[in-house]
A protein has these predicted regions:
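Short beta-to-alpha linker loops that shape the active-site pocket of alpha/beta-hydrolase fold enzymes
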Residues: 162-164, 244, 458
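Non-catalytic accessory segments of hydrolases
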Residues: 2-177, 349, 376, 380, ...
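Short glycine-enriched nucleophile-adjacent loop
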Residues: 217-229
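Gly/Ala-rich beta-loop-alpha elbow adjacent to hydrolase catalytic centers
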Residues: 212, 216
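Mobile gating loops/cap/lid regions near enzyme active sites that modulate substrate access
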Residues: 399-427, 433-583
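Gly/Ser-rich "nucleophile elbow"/oxyanion-hole loop immediately N-terminal to the catalytic nucleophile
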Residues: 114-116, 172-182, 189-211, 275-279
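Loop/turn elements at helix/coil->beta-strand transitions in domains of secreted/extracellular proteins
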Residues: 114-119, 126, 151-155, 204-208, ...
Length: 583
């Protein structure tokens, strides 16, 4: 099984593994602005669930979603998880999909209805092209239960948003009509609904923290940078796991890279039979809105449902992230952000044996044609600069030799499967996709005097092969305190020896830190030194040098480290973020 296949197996989602079956004794009722909902009481967790609550009118395709504008008498049920929005990837397996998908779920502790509780709003990941709030791995019951046990109860919310082309249409026509970045706008509308209605569930609208992983963390960053950092009072804190940084730049080539997004749109139009004759004209959107959803879905499956991305539209994103960070045009709220030690094993190429292989991959993914216009440098020279900062030395690549002691040699099985420069390749692409943007954000927050915290997750879950290291997504079960392993196969907390007990203890530590931040905007809470092996989790400060300090989560505890690993490579990426990567 390849690393990619192993990762997909870990992420498998049989629908039978959805949240613990609710045991209804009496249905909780809540009256919001539009009417009254009946939820479900779960006696096992002593929690109330309100599931599949709409936060918008059924969306008009390729249009900005509108808030609810009708009221009703009587009681509507909120007993079932919503469908997924249309998406393209394994996270869709086993789930019904629909364009009518803008719903959210609320999990609250029972009996605390008028306490003004802090709220944690989860934004799922999946590349902005797959996933949904009904995913059992995002079961909010466990972290809500943990919050009650700590004496710091919170309300959990999870939300859907449109994906792929439905949510992230690109091209000149979409920008002209103001319908780019619709998925992020959906999230914004959900946060507005929470702001207006969460008090009815016992939540405090002034104590909302948004959190997400991967493209969910990218979404969290998008909300922080949205509208030039405008503060709409929708949330006061943000947590980004493996993805916080720059929502723009998926099509590198510098700040004038527009050909590939337009080409993606044109190819999509040509793949829709009812609209292909209009490709290249200015009237394609009207046609795309009229055809059946099944025709759009089939076209995306054939033309690339995973090819869509956020774009600079002059409205939701008024400027590039690089410029906003430099000028302080972002929402100045406390953030807790980080990533996993070996992110690159999920994003690097395979079978990279020599410099030529690596150069080819870098040119495809990072430094394409056109950068000469924005950098004034020769493309090959830029590749040389990058490779100089990432030497072919397995002792400094990922996964580390501590995590996986095997040194890849010519002729061994790992060389055949992964390539001789596997570790070097992983380090470059992991830093590019996940790490440098996060570090750049921590530094910007520090320069502008805003509290931020950084972590590095360094625990390899049960079922993750050693050669994959501590890869992408592996912290999610620990954050949610999902020690039952709901939605996972195998259970990340299974295994032999002391690992299960140690992993569960670390999950308690991590989820406690997140709960502390949601309550206090500080992960330390009242017992920081006790929580972090005698240390306090420090805010990210630059007074002692060019890099701050953060917490590392290990299987046997935590320690504090200076955030300066692979500094040369990530500094180069940050310096070229706008001119090469277009963010």
């Amino acid at each position: 099984m390849s690393l990619i296949d192993a990762g997909r197996a870990l992420l498998s989602l049989p629908q039978a593994l959805l949240y613990p079956p609710p045991q209804t004794t009496s249905a909780p009722l809540v009256t919001v602005r539009n009417g009254t909902y009946s939820g479900v009481y779960n006696s096992q967790y002593d929690q109330d669930y309100f599931l599949g609550v709409p936060f918008a009118q059924p969306p008009v395709r390729f249009s900005i979603a509108q808030g609810l504008n009708t009221t009703w008498d009587g009681i509507r049920t909120a007993h079932e998880y919503p469908v997924h929005c249309y998406g393209y990837g394994w996270d869709q397996d086993g789930f019904e999909q629909s364009e009518d998908c803008l719903y959210l779920n609320i999990v609250r502790p029972a009996g605390l209805h008028n306490h003004g509780l802090p709220v944690a709003a989860w934004i799922h990941g999946g590349g902005l092209w797959m996933g949904g709030a009904a995913d059992p791995r995002y079961n909010l019951s466990f972290i809500v239960e943990q919050s009650v046990a700590l004496g710091k109860p919170v309300i959990g919310v999870s939300l859907n948003y449109r994906l792929s082309a439905f949510g992230f249409l690109m091209g000149k026509e979409a920008i002209k009509e103001g319908v780019a970045n619709l998925g992020f706008r959906d999230q914004r509308l959900a946060l507005s609904w929470i702001n207006e209605n969460i008090a009815a569930f016992g939540g405090d609208p002034n104590k909302v923290t948004i959190f997400g992983e991967s493209s969910g963390a990218e979404s969290v960053a998008a909300q922080v940078f949205a509208f030039n950092g405008r503060d709409d009072g929708l949330f006061r804190g943000a947590i980004g796991e493996s993805g916080f940084g720059a929502p723009l730049g998926r099509y590198p080539g510098g700040f004038n890279a527009t050909e590939r997004p337009q080409g993606t749109y044109d190819s999509f139009v040509r793949s829709v039979p009812s609209c292909k004759k209009l490709a290249g004209s200015d009237s394609t959107l009207d046609c795309l809105r009229r055809v059946p959803s099944e025709e759009i879905d089939l076209a995306l499956r054939s033309s690339g449902g995973q090819s869509w991305a956020p774009v600079l539209d002059g409205d939701f994103f008024a400027d590039y992230t690089t410029n906003q960070l430099a000028s302080g045009r972002f929402l100045k709220i406390p953030i807790l952000i980080g990533a996993n030690t070996d992110e690159g094993t999920s994003f690097g190429f395979r079978r990279v044996d020599d410099d030529d292989d690596l150069r080819a991959g870098i040119k495809v993914m990072m430094i394409p044609y056109g950068v000469e216009k924005t950098t004034g440098k020769i493309r090959d020279g830029l590749v040389d600069e990058l490779l100089e900062r990432y030497p072919n030395n397995q002792s400094i690549g990922i996964p580390s030799l501590e995590t996986w002691p095997h040194v890849i040699q010519p002729g061994d099985g790992y060389a055949e499967e992964f390539g001789l420069q596997y570790r070097r390749d992983n380090a470059i692409f992991g830093d590019y996709v996940m790490q440098y943007q996060r570090r750049r954000a921590n530094k910007a927050w520090a320069k502008h005097g805003v509290p931020s915290y950084v972590y590095r997750f360094n625990i390899r879950p049960n079922g993750q092969p050693p050669e994959a290291g501590v890869g992408h997504f592996q912290e999610v079960a620990f954050v949610f305190h999902n020690t039952n392993g709901d939605g996972y196969e195998p259970n990340p907390f299974g295994g032999n020896g002391t690992y299960p007990a140690d992993a569960k203890a670390m999950s308690k530590t991590i989820s406690t830190a997140w709960i502390n931040f949601i309550n206090d905007l500080d992960p330390n809470g009242d017992s920081g030194p006790e929580l972090f092996n005698g240390n306090k989790w420090p805010t990210y400060e630059l007074s002692g040098g060019p890099n701050g300090k953060g917490v590392v989560f290990n299987i046997n505890g935590t320690h504090i480290e200076v955030d300066d690993w692979r500094a040369g490579g990530m500094e180069w990426m940050a310096e070229h973020a706008l001119t090469v990567f277009g963010n």
